[in-house]
C-alpha cells in the first residue's frame, strides 16, 4: 500500500512503514476469512489466490447480473449497446432497478463558453459557438451571446513598449533629488536629526548636524522650547564649550546671565519657570572641569 508520504515525493519514516504493513496484514487476514466463508458456506467457486474482483463477480452472478471479462456488468437480457457499454449511462434503462439519469447539463447545449472564445485568427473555432441557437434556452437573453464578437485576450502582453512606441526612444527622465536645497523639507531627515537650541530658526542653510551628540535627552528636548539668544555660529551641542573653551563665549554669557537672574529660573515660552533637577547643566563652569584622556590625575 502506498502511503500519502511516499506519493508526495518523500521517503516515509519507519513508523509509517510499520503502520502500512500492519494495515496490509489486517486487510489480507479479513479478505482470507471472507473468501473461506464464501467457499465453505456460500458454494462460491473462487480460485485459491483471488482478489476482491473475483468476489464481486461471484456476488453479481448470484444476484442475476452478467459480468464480462472486461468488467462490463448488466442484468441478464438487458445488454447495453456497444457504444455506451464501456462508458457512463446516457439514459434510463428499462430493465434496471435503479434509474440512472445523465447529467442535467448534457441535455441542453450551453451557449455560454466556459473559457475564452477562440480568436478570429484561430483555425479551430470555439466549440461553444452555435450558429443556430436553440429556442429552448433556459434564459432568453442568453440566445444572443453566441453572436457576440470573440474575445481577444492575450496572456503574452509585452512588458516593455515596442520600438514603434514614441516613448521607447525617449525614456522618461529621472528627477535628481534635491537633497542640498532644503534638507528639512523631507520628514524622514527631520526626524532623524537631533534637536538643537537653534532649531526654531528657519535658516536658508541650517547649521551642520554634528555626527556625535553626547548631550542628555532631557536637555535636548528642553532646548526646543527655551528661547536662547545665540549667534548664527552657535554650536548645536550644549557640551561643546566644555571640550572647546576657545569657542564663542557669547552663548555661555547669555545662559549664565539668564541663570543669574532670579536664581534657578529660565525663560519658557515668554515666561519664567523653575527647571527640575537634571536640566541645570550650564551652571558648571569650564574651568571647574578637568578632562583627562587616558592619563590618571597625579
Curated annotation (Swiss-Prot):
Residues 96-128 have a biased composition (Low complexity). GO terms for molecular function: DNA binding; DNA-binding transcription factor activity. It holds the Pfam family BES1_N. It comes from the Eukaryota. The keyword rRNA processing does not apply. The modification Phosphoserine is found at residue 156. Keywords: Brassinosteroid signaling pathway, Cytoplasm, DNA-binding, Growth regulation, Nucleus, Phosphoprotein, Repressor, Transcription, Transcription regulation, Ubl conjugation. The keyword Cell inner membrane does not apply. Residues 1-25, 71-129, 153-175, 190-217 are annotated as: Disordered. Residues 204-224 are annotated as: PEST-like. It is found in: Nucleus; Cytoplasm. Changing residue 206 to L: Increases lamina joint bending. GO terms for cellular component: cytoplasm; nucleus. Residues 10-91 are annotated as: Required for DNA-binding. Plants silencing BZR1 are dwarf with erect leaves, and have reduced brassinosteroid sensitivity and altered expression of brassinosteroid-responsive genes. Interacts with GF14C. Interacts with PUB24. Interacts with SMOS1. PANTHER family: BES1/BZR1 HOMOLOG PROTEIN 3-RELATED, BES1_BZR1 HOMOLOG PROTEIN 2. Positive brassinosteroid-signaling protein. Mediates downstream brassinosteroid-regulated growth response and feedback inhibition of brassinosteroid (BR) biosynthetic genes. May act as transcriptional repressor by binding the brassinosteroid-response element (BREE) (5'-CGTG(T/C)G-3') in the promoter of DLT (AC Q9LWU9), another positive regulator of BR signaling. Acts as a transcriptional repressor of LIC, a negative regulator of BR signaling, by binding to the BRRE element of its promoter. BZR1 and LIC play opposite roles in BR signaling and regulation of leaf bending. This is Protein BZR1 homolog 1. It comes from Oryza sativa subsp. japonica (Rice).
Amino acid at each position: 500500500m502506498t502511503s500519502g508520504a511516499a506519493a508526495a515525493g518523500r521517503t516515509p519514516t519507519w513508523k509509517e512503514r510499520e503502520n502500512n504493513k500492519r494495515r496490509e496484514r489486517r486487510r489480507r487476514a479479513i479478505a482470507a476469512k471472507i473468501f473461506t466463508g464464501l467457499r465453505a458456506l456460500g458454494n462460491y467457486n473462487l480460485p485459491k489466490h483471488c482478489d476482491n474482483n473475483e468476489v464481486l463477480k461471484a456476488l453479481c452472478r448470484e444476484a442475476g447480473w452478467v459480468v464480462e471479462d472486461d468488467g462490463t456488468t448488466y442484468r441478464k437480457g438487458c445488454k447495453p449497446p456497444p457504444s455506451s457499454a464501456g462508458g457512463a449511462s446516457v439514459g434510463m434503462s428499462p430493465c434496471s432497478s435503479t434509474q440512472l439519469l445523465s447529467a442535467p447539463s448534457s441535455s441542453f447545449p450551453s451557449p455560454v463558453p466556459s473559457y475564452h472564445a477562440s480568436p478570429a485568427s484561430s483555425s479551430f473555432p470555439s466549440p461553444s459557438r452555435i450558429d443556430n441557437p436553440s429556442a429552448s434556452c433556459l434564459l432568453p437573453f442568453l440566445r444572443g451571446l453566441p453572436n457576440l464578437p470573440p474575445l481577444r485576450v492575450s496572456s503574452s502582453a509585452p512588458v516593455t513598449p515596442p520600438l514603434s512606441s514614441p516613448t521607447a526612444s525617449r525614456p522618461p527622465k529621472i528627477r535628481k533629488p534635491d537633497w542640498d536645497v532644503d534638507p528639512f523639507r523631507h520628514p524622514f531627515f527631520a526626524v532623524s536629526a537631533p534637536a538643537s537650541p537653534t532649531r526654531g530658526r528657519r535658516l536658508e542653510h541650517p547649521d551642520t548636524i554634528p555626527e556625535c551628540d553626547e548631550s542628555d535627552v532631557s536637555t535636548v528636548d528642553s532646548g526646543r522650547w527655551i528661547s536662547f539668544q545665540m549667534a548664527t555660529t552657535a554650536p548645536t551641542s550644549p557640551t561643546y564649550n566644555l571640550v572647546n573653551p576657545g569657542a564663542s563665549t557669547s552663548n555661555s554669557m547669555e545662559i549664565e546671565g539668564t541663570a543669574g537672574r532670579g536664581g534657578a529660573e529660565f525663560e519658557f515660552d515668554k515666561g519664567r519657570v523653575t527647571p527640575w533637577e537634571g536640566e541645570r547643566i550650564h551652571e558648571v563652569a569650564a574651568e571647574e572641569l578637568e578632562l583627562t584622556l587616558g592619563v590618571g590625575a597625579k
